[in-house]
């Protein structure tokens, strides 16, 4: 069997078991040697005509099924007979009875082997035929002349063929399990008769098909949700490779979102769940010879629930995200991983995280957190902003010798839009920050090697979430980057981030109105009174301090927008734009070179309070800040327009 497109390992997982393993276990038995032992017992004793007839009938069954294969003779027939004869008495009438029982075992085993081999041959023939058809279909799929309708029909055919392979394998599995169970029942009955005749069956050791009957595998206890990543990692590394694969195949929902499980393994589990969510709808459409859109339009007609449809839609958005990021550079593709996946989270908005590059092996990892209006359901994982892709490509260009993995983290419930009243409160940021901290802290546990560098970047409401992950959730990372931040909630200064030698970096365009909301911090501090557990009290209005302000303790980098001549809401979405000042700076920071911002001329002065000039006798005119006023004066306003460009691209490696 030469399969080009069917993955046997994946097929076994989808079918629920391995028919080849069952057939192999049956063929480990040695029916010919059991038959020879039976002949020796039969010949050694005094037998009646009835015993002789029974033996000959069993011998005919054996001869009809045995495949005449020779093998080693691990036992000495005469020695075994002599041992039993000494125990039972010479010329005992029991010896021929033992011979009959043994011959029946040999016949049962030979029949089971023949049936199993025939069923496997049929299955392999079916799979070969399906694989050949898949080859033809996939070849046609590359034909540019195909019309849209023809391409849709071809996709449906491919899906149908894949399901046929699963169904055929599952059917073979069931039949082989039945064959083995039948042989096992007969074996146990024959062994009982042998013991009754005085034979302990020692001569059968290793001959009667091991693993028959199959003992049910002991369940593997999976750590419950909320278990710390270090404990989960110790548990995972204690498992054998076979046990890990079994858990991924049987319990992907539990493994895929378990911090402490390596990224590649949790991705395999999450992709298995995502694929199942997609195929649940696609298979129905194929079965009824209709379109997926028809099924989605009237799910009840096809026996599907609203939850099935939500799972499908968010799985589809997630799959688009994986495909979009995987096609980043066809000449030098980077692997993508589904780090997290829960299509039903947040009332059906979905939860997912996609990694470009493997955080477990990359020297640097950047985690980006989006803001308002972002969700799996809304397509953030594959929309045209390309936040993760742009950062990945520029960080890679900045330092190709020390790769940076980038995680697009859509792991919290962001406000729906700017009309969502929750946007004015930090509630979602605090809840999301706790989840973010758990995921990021787990990266340190599974990382291979030493010297990892982790940067967490948040945009808009996502920057408030990042701030709370540090200040409230105990998130551990080297650096933080806040973009267009409307306020840092519980992080009242850079010290609240508890960075060990790292920095809080801030990108705040002087024309971005959202980044100015933190200047109203006096109101938000008054009404947002959070206890140590982060429970909101009072009115909970406002999002906290402006991190771009003088005195916060952050490092501000340039993030201006070319040709912007005033406050513009669109400038709030420019930070990840390719060629922007902000992306250039973020690429340096994420690749571990934040200290290069000064030499590259990318630092910006913080905002400060307005001042007044006072003439002081003997000192002259002195400007002082007006007490109680927000840091509303932005030095970036005074930059010449010609100095703001969008050509800040790493065309050649800067750091080696």
From Swiss-Prot:
Compositional bias, Basic and acidic residues, is annotated for: 645-656
Source taxon at top rank: Bacteria
Q: Region Disordered: list its residue ranges.
A: 623-656
| The name this protein goes by in its record | Uncharacterized protein Rv2079
State the taxonomy lineage.
Bacteria, Bacillati, Actinomycetota, Actinomycetes, Mycobacteriales
């Amino acid at each position: 069997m030469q399969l080009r497109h069917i993955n046997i390992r994946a097929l076994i997982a989808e079918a629920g078991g391995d028919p080849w393993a069952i057939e192999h276990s049956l063929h480990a038995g040695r029916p010919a040697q059991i038959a020879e032992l039976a002949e020796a017992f039969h010949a050694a004793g005094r037998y009646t005509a009835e015993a002789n007839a029974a033996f000959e009938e069993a011998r005919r069954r054996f001869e009809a099924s045995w495949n005449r294969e020779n093998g080693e003779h691990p036992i000495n027939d005469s020695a075994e007979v002599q041992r039993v004869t000494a125990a039972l008495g010479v010329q005992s009438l029991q010896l021929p009875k033992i011979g009959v029982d043994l011959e029946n075992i040999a016949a049962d085993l030979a029949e089971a082997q023949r049936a199993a081999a025939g069923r496997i041959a049929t299955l392999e023939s079916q799979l070969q035929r399906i694989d050949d058809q898949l080859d033809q279909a996939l070849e046609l799929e590359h034909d540019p002349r195909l019309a849209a309708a023809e391409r849709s029909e071809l996709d449906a055919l491919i899906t149908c063929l894949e399901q046929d392979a699963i169904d055929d394998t599952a059917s073979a599995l069931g039949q082989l399990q039945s064959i083995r169970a039948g042989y096992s029942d007969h074996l146990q009955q024959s062994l009982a008769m042998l013991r009754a005749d005085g034979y302990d069956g020692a001569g059968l050791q290793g001959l009667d098909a091991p693993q028959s009957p199959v003992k049910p595998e002991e369940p593997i206890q999976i750590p419950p949700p909320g278990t710390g990543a270090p404990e989960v990692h110790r548990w995972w590394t204690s498992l054998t490779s076979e046990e890990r694969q079994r858990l991924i195949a049987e319990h992907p929902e539990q493994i895929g979102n378990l911090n402490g499980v390596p990224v590649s393994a949790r991705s395999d589990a999450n992709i298995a769940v995502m694929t199942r969510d997609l195929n649940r709808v696609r298979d129905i459409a194929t079965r009824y010879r209709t379109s997926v859109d028809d099924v989605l339009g009237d799910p009840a007609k096809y026996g599907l629930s609203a939850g099935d449809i939500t799972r499908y839609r968010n799985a589809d958005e997630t799959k688009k995200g994986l495909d979009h990021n995987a096609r980043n550079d066809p000449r030098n593709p980077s692997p993508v991983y589904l780090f997290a996946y829960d299509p039903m989270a947040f009332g059906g908005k979905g939860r997912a995280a996609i990694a470009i590059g493997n955080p477990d092996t990359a020297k640097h990892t950047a985690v980006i957190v989006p803001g308002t209006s972002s969700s799996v359901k809304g397509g953030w994982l594959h929309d045209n902003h390309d936040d993760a892709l742009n950062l990945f490509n520029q960080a890679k260009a900045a330092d190709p010798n020390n790769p940076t993995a980038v995680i697009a983290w859509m792991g919290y419930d962001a406000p729906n839009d700017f009309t969502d009243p929750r946007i004015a409160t930090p509630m979602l940021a605090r809840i999301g920050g706790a989840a973010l901290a758990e995921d990021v802290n787990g990266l340190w546990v599974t990382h291979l090697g030493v010297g990892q560098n982790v940067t967490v970047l948040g945009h808009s409401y996502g920057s408030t979430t990042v701030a709370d992950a540090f200040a409230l959730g105990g998130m551990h990372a080297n650096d933080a980057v806040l973009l267009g931040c409307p306020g840092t909630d519980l992080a009242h200064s850079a010290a609240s981030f508890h960075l060990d030698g790292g920095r809080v970096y801030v990108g705040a365009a002087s024309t971005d109105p959202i980044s100015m909301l933190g200047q109203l911090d006096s109101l938000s501090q008054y009404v947002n009174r959070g206890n140590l557990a982060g429970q909101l009290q009072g009115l909970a209005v406002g999002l906290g301090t402006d991190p771009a302000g003088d005195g916060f303790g952050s490092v501000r980098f340039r993030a201006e927008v070319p040709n912007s001549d005033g406050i513009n809401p669109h400038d709030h979405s420019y930070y990840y734009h390719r060629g922007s000042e902000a992306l250039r700076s973020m690429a340096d920071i994420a690749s571990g070179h934040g200290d290069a911002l000064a030499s590259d001329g990318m630092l910006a002065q913080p905002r400060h309070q307005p001042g007044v000039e006072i003439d002081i006798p003997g000192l002259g005119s002195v400007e002082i800040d007006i007490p109680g006023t927000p840091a509303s004066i932005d030095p970036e306003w005074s930059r010449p327009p010609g100095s703001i460009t969008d050509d800040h691209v790493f065309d050649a490696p800067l750091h080696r």
